[in-house]
């Protein structure tokens, strides 16, 4: 458990899940295929490792990681989930501003930690259909870390197949972020606009 807490503090594993996913389009009536989810996890994992292992300048690498994140993570679903009940009283304009701010917040918080994932490996164990999409169970191997069991939750609710959550040794990414966002909102007396503005300034 100490290891997991340290990883959460360092923020290096959580964001990796955002990139181990896929973007194939599917129809509403077409079930998300487990094999496709698994193959695309391997594909995107390889892509990200190529980025972080390159000799390019740090700003270039961060920019490339941000681009991948925007493509493969369902930030709209993630943002609304982390906002919690407050989303029901927010206007459409407020929600759009929050979703944009949440994406910036996530990029600033996690993308630059990808250097710590260099030479890491992911092993796919199993996958299974779940109510909201597909759950892919993996084991993540990193240098100087004990292996971790990581679950990636993939959905096509947005019209594209994207990652929307990750669970690391029982610790739920969205639940953790929801608590943190909730505290930030409470500290701002429930002011969603102020929360959104603040998210853009967090490194």
Where are the language model's segments positioned?
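Bacterial N-terminal signal peptides that target proteins for export
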Residues: 3-15
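C-terminal segment of classical bacterial N-terminal signal peptides
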Residues: 18-28
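Short, low-structural-confidence N-terminal segments
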Residues: 26-36, 141
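Surface-exposed, polar/charged faces of alpha-helical domains
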Residues: 32, 50, 54-60, 89-93, ...
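Early exported N-terminus immediately downstream of N-terminal targeting peptides
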Residues: 33-110
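Surface-exposed, charged secondary-structure patches
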Residues: 108-148, 198, 202-203
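Short beta-strand edge/turn micro-motifs at domain boundaries
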Residues: 147-175
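Low-complexity, intrinsically disordered terminal/linker segments enriched in charged
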Residues: 165-203
């Amino acid at each position: 458990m100490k290891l997991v807490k340290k990883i959460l503090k360092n923020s290096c594993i959580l964001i990796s899940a955002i990139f181990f996913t896929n973007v194939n389009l599917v129809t509403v009536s077409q079930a998300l295929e487990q094999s496709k989810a698994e193959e695309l996890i391997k594909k995107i994992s390889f892509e990200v490792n190529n980025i972080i292992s390159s000799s390019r300048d740090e700003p270039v690498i961060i920019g490339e990681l941000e681009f991948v994140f925007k493509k493969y993570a369902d930030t709209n679903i993630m943002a609304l989930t982390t906002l919690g009940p407050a989303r029901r009283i927010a206007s459409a304009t407020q929600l759009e501003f929050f979703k944009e701010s949440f994406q910036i917040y996530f990029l600033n918080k996690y993308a630059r930690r990808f250097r710590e994932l260099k030479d890491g490996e992911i092993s796919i164990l199993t996958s299974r259909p779940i109510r909201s999409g597909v759950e892919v169970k993996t084991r993540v191997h990193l240098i100087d870390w004990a292996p971790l069991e990581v679950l990636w939750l993939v959905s096509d609710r947005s019209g594209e197949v994207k990652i929307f959550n990750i669970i690391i040794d029982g610790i739920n990414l969205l639940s953790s972020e929801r608590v943190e966002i909730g505290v930030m909102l409470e500290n701002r007396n429930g002011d969603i606009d102020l929360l959104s503005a603040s998210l853009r300034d967090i490194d």
